[in-house]
């Protein structure tokens, strides 16, 4: 994500490297290039890199001009769903695949997660917790948060005719909080699988117990405040380890 600012850093700090760049690619674009030999990208990918102007429905010329980027650095744009190339002979041999298989889809991790959960329409939300926690909601209008507390990307089914934007709220401390709970709720030792089974014993909503997982430093969603992690709603004679897990 945020490829534009990373590219600007390279341009300023490693100009010799910047001058050698032919095309910029997200990881998915690079993998597709290795599979097909074709360099291309998608609107969804460009929006994750902050290169897309939703009002103009084009590469963000104002941003390219601001950073002094040449438009030629942007790869050809292909539909998120549609033929983006075919597996070439080299990749087929390396991977044991049949040459000529079409590559027809690519997207980032959170749009992919939303796709897997059938989240496509305004008001629908996908949530996941891993290294970070993410709440990803689909919006049907072009707008943004002027405080940059959330990120807005083109969702996998976004088109010029049908606005479908993924609004991404990232909670950075979720993964490490899971590790903290593992170490401190059951210091005698417990696996993550056992934690999941223990948590399944609690009712939905954990009888009012909630954990604010902000123990990993400042959070952009809170305007860079450091609030710390806290457990709320716990009642000593009611709640058990299952609720906290």
Give residue spans per PLM region.
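Gly/charged, well-structured mid-domain segments that form the phosphate/adenylate-handling core
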Residues: 80-87
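Active-site core segments that coordinate phosphate-bearing ligands/cofactors
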Residues: 1-39, 45, 50-61, 65-68, ...
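Positively charged, low-complexity/disordered segments
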Residues: 243-245
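A conserved helix-loop-beta module that forms one wall/lid of the active-site cleft
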Residues: 67-79
């Amino acid at each position: 994500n945020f490829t534009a600012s990373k590219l600007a850093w390279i341009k300023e700090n490693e100009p010799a490297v910047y001058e050698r760049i032919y095309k910029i690619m997200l990881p998915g674009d690079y993998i597709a290039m290795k599979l097909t030999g074709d360099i291309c990208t998608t609107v969804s990918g460009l929006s994750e890199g902050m290169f897309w102007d939703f009002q103009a429905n084009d590469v963000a010329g104002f941003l390219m001009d601001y950073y002094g980027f040449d438009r030629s650095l942007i790869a050809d744009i292909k539909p998120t769903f549609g033929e983006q190339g075919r597996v070439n002979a080299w990749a087929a041999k390396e991977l044991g695949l049949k040459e000529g298989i079409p590559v027809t889809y690519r997207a980032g991790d959170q749009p992919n997660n939303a796709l897997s959960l059938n989240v496509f329409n305004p008001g629908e939300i996908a949530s996941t917790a891993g290294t970070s926690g993410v709440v990803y909601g689909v919006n049907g209008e072009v707008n943004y948060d002027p405080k940059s507390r959330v990120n807005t990307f083109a969702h996998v089914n976004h088109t010029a005719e049908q606005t479908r934007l993924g609004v991404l709220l990232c909670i950075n401390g979720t993964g490490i909080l899971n590790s903290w709970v593992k170490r401190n709720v059951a210091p005698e030792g417990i696996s993550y699988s056992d934690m999941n089974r223990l948590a399944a014993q609690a009712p939905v909503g954990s009888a009012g117990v909630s954990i604010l997982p902000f123990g990993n430093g400042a959070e952009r969603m809170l305007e860079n405040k450091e609030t710390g992690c806290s457990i709320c709603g716990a009642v000593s004679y009611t709640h058990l380890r299952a609720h906290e897990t």
